[in-house]
Amino acid sequence: MTIPFDHWPEWPQHSDRTRRKIEEVFQSNRWAISGYWTGEESMERKFAKAFADFNGVPYCVPTTSGSTALMLALEALGIGEGDEVIVPSLTWIATATAVLNVNALPVFVDVEADTYCIDPQLIKSAITDKTKAIIPVHLFGSMANMDEINEIAQEHNLFVIEDCAQSHGSVWNNQRAGTIGDIGAFSCQQGKVLTAGEGGIIVTKNPRLFELIQQLRADSRVYCDDSSELMHGDMQLVKKGDIQGSNYCLSEFQSAILLDQLQELDDKNAIREKNAMFLNDALSKIDGIKVMKRPPQVSRQTYYGYVFRFDPVKFGGLNADQFCEILREKLNMGTFYLHPPYLPVHKNPLFCPWTKNRYLKSVRKTEAYWRGLHYPVSERASGQSIVIHHAILLAEPSHLSLLVDAVAELARKFCVTH
C-alpha cells in the first residue's frame, strides 16, 4: 500500500508570525549587522541573546553556516598548520573539512555501534604530540559521551569543540549540547530542527573566545560597547583588530526567522522525542531490527534523524540503499525524508582534499592515504542503517504506525530464521 505524501509533515515549517518577523526587517532598513543603527537592536543580537539564554551560556555568535561555525571555533582556539584534530569517521564531511580549512589535519576515530557517536575508548590511541582538539559530533539523535571525552581532553590538555549541527536542545547531565566543551557549533541549514535555510551559531562560556569569534566573523570588528550613544545612521560595528577576520555574518532576515523558530524548538523536540520512543518500542519488536541506545546521562534527546539498524542476513541480503528504496515506495517519502546514513568521511566521494593544492601543501596527504583508512563500525553503519528525517517524527502516531507496518511487512517478506 502506498500512502499520499500529504500525510507526512513537510519541512521547514513557518507561520504568519514568521512572515511578520521578516516584514519587520524589511521595514527596519537594516538588513545586516553591517547596516546602520536605527534605534532598535538588530535581529541578530536579539537572536544571539535568546539562543544564549536557551542554552544557559553568556555568549553566542551567529554566523553563516555550521561549517563556518566549526572553522571559526578552530581559529579562535589558535589551531592551524601542523596541528591535528580528532574527529569521528562517521559524520557529515564538514566536520573534517573545517579542520582542513584551518590547514590542520583531521584524524579519524571510529564510532560506537549503538550510538554512532565517536568512541571515547579509541580516542586515546589517536592522540599524538600534535593533537590540539577533539570534535565530538552529536549525530542524528544521539549524544557523544561528553563525560569521558572531557576527561580525556583534560588529561591531555586538549580543547573540545562540540559539533551540535544535529542536536539543538539535547541535554546531557543537565547541560545543553554545545555548552559542555570549550565551544559549541550549530548548523541552521534547511534540514535542521532550527533552520533559516542556511546559518550557523557558536556558543561559549569564555569571554576571550567570544571576543575573538566576533572579530573572526565580522572582518575584525565587534559591536560597540554602548549603543545608547549612537545616532540614527551610525555604524554599530567598530574596529577591533585583535585577530584577522572575514565576513561570515548572518543576515537580519535569517536572524528573524531563527528568532521566530526558536520559540517552538523545545515543544517540537518534545513531540519528536515522544514519537521516537513510540518507534523504539514498536520497531524493536521486529526480528532483525535494532534501535539506537540512549545513554542514561541524556535527559532530553533531539532527533535530527531517527535511526534504526537492520540485520542484512535476516532481510534477505538487502543493503541500506535497497531497504530505503522499498520503504520510500511504500511510504511515499523522498530521499530528503528517508535515506541511509552518511558514508564514512574517508570513503565519501564528497571528501576529496587531494583535489586542492592548498590542502596538499598544508596536510600533505594523498588520495591513497585517505581512501586506504579503515573504520569498521562506520563502514557497516552506512550499509545497515536507516535514517528518518525529524519532520516525520511530527506526524500523527497513526501515520507512524504505517512506517512500522512497512518495516514489519519487509521483515515478513525477507525473513530468514535460524
From Swiss-Prot:
Enzyme Commission designation: 2.6.1.100, 2.6.1.101
GO biological process, one term: antibiotic biosynthetic process
Keyword Cell membrane applies: no
Chemical reaction(s) catalysed: 2-deoxy-L-scyllo-inosose + L-glutamine = 2-deoxy-scyllo-inosamine + 2-oxoglutaramate; 3-amino-2,3-dideoxy-scyllo-inosose + L-glutamine = 2-deoxystreptamine + 2-oxoglutaramate
Keywords annotated in UniProt: Aminotransferase, Antibiotic biosynthesis, Pyridoxal phosphate, Transferase
SUPFAM superfamilies in alphabetical order: PLP-dependent transferases (SSF53383)
Top-level taxon of the source organism: Bacteria
Swiss-Prot/TrEMBL cofactor(s): pyridoxal 5'-phosphate
Pathway this chain belongs to: Metabolic intermediate biosynthesis; 2-deoxystreptamine biosynthesis; 2-deoxystreptamine from D-glucose 6-phosphate: step 2/4; Metabolic intermediate biosynthesis; 2-deoxystreptamine biosynthesis; 2-deoxystreptamine from D-glucose 6-phosphate: step 4/4; Antibiotic biosynthesis; butirosin biosynthesis
Residues modified as N6-(pyridoxal phosphate)lysine: K192
Gene Ontology molecular functions: pyridoxal phosphate binding; transaminase activity
InterPro entries recorded: DegT/StrS_aminotransferase (IPR000653), PyrdxlP-dep_Trfase (IPR015424), PyrdxlP-dep_Trfase_major (IPR015421), PyrdxlP-dep_Trfase_small (IPR015422)
Function: Catalyzes the PLP-dependent transamination of 2-deoxy-scyllo-inosose (2-DOI) to form 2-deoxy-scyllo-inosamine (2-DOIA) using L-glutamine as the amino donor. Also catalyzes the transamination of 3-amino-2,3-dideoxy-scyllo-inosose (keto-2-DOIA) into 2-deoxystreptamine (2-DOS).
Similarity comment: Belongs to the DegT/DnrJ/EryC1 family. L-glutamine:2-deoxy-scyllo-inosose/scyllo-inosose aminotransferase subfamily.
Protein name listed in UniProt: L-glutamine:2-deoxy-scyllo-inosose aminotransferase
Species of origin: Niallia circulans (Bacillus circulans)
Taxon lineage: Bacteria, Bacillati, Bacillota, Bacilli, Bacillales
Gene: btrR
